[in-house]
């Protein structure tokens, strides 16, 4: 079954949006298989955002992601990577569609609440970076048969 990595960034945690964000994925029918609240080390932040290391905003991004608690999650379900991206919305909250997490709750590009893997391959890399295998729990909700044929 397809999996994706989702992180509620420190601004989402500080604003009390964790429950509402999790609810978006649950009501869509995805299964939460990994969840932890944590403070992010500089090493982990730099590995996660390695793709941006040459960008001018890299150091401020690292400082921001370390600035407070973050909720790291792994969600499972059919088409979860692409669907999660739609649920999250455009990177810039000012251009994100209403009805998306960023469109409804986001205020600025630098504080866009949430991260979601952008591809199946990226999801696997990010899951392996943020979670140990024993931290993930595979299970099948009884409602799955009502969601997926």
From Swiss-Prot:
- Name the needed cofactors: Mg(2+)
Q: Does the keyword Coiled coil feature in the UniProt annotation?
A: no
Where is the major localization of this protein? cytoplasm
Protein name (record): Nucleoside diphosphate kinase
Q: Which PROSITE patterns match?
A: NDPK, NDPK_LIKE
Query: Where are the annotated coiled coils located?
Result: none
- What processes does the entry annotate via GO biological process terms? CTP biosynthetic process; GTP biosynthetic process; UTP biosynthetic process
Q: List the disulfide bonds.
A: none
Taxonomic lineage of the native organism: Bacteria, Bacillati, Cyanobacteriota, Cyanophyceae, Oscillatoriophycideae
Gene expressing this chain: ndk
Q: Which InterPro entries match?
A: NDK-like_dom, NDK-like_dom_sf, Nucleoside_diP_kinase, Nucleoside_diP_kinase_AS
Query: What organism does this protein naturally occur in?
Result: Trichodesmium erythraeum (strain IMS101)
Catalysed reactions, semicolon-separated: a 2'-deoxyribonucleoside 5'-diphosphate + ATP = a 2'-deoxyribonucleoside 5'-triphosphate + ADP; a ribonucleoside 5'-diphosphate + ATP = a ribonucleoside 5'-triphosphate + ADP
Subunit composition and interactions: Homotetramer.
Q: Where is the active site?
A: 115
What protein family does this chain belong to?
Belongs to the NDK family.
The residues that the entry says bind ATP are: 9, 57, 85, 91, 102, 112
């Amino acid at each position: 079954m397809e999996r994706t990595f989702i992180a509620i960034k420190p601004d989402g945690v500080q604003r009390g949006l964790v429950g509402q964000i999790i609810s978006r994925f649950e009501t869509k029918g995805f299964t939460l298989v990994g969840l932890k609240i944590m403070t992010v080390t500089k090493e982990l932040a730099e590995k996660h955002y390695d793709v941006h290391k040459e960008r001018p905003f890299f150091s401020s991004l690292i400082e921001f992601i370390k600035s407070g608690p973050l909720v790291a999650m792994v969600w499972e379900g059919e088409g979860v990577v692409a669907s999660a991206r739609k649920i999250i919305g455009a990177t810039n909250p000012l251009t994100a569609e209403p009805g998306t997490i960023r469109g409804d709750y986001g205020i600025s590009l630098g504080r866009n609440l949430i991260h979601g893997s952008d591809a199946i391959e990226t999801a696997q890399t990010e899951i392996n970076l943020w979670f140990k295998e024993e931290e993930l729990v595979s299970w099948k909700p009884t409602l799955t048969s009502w969601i997926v044929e």
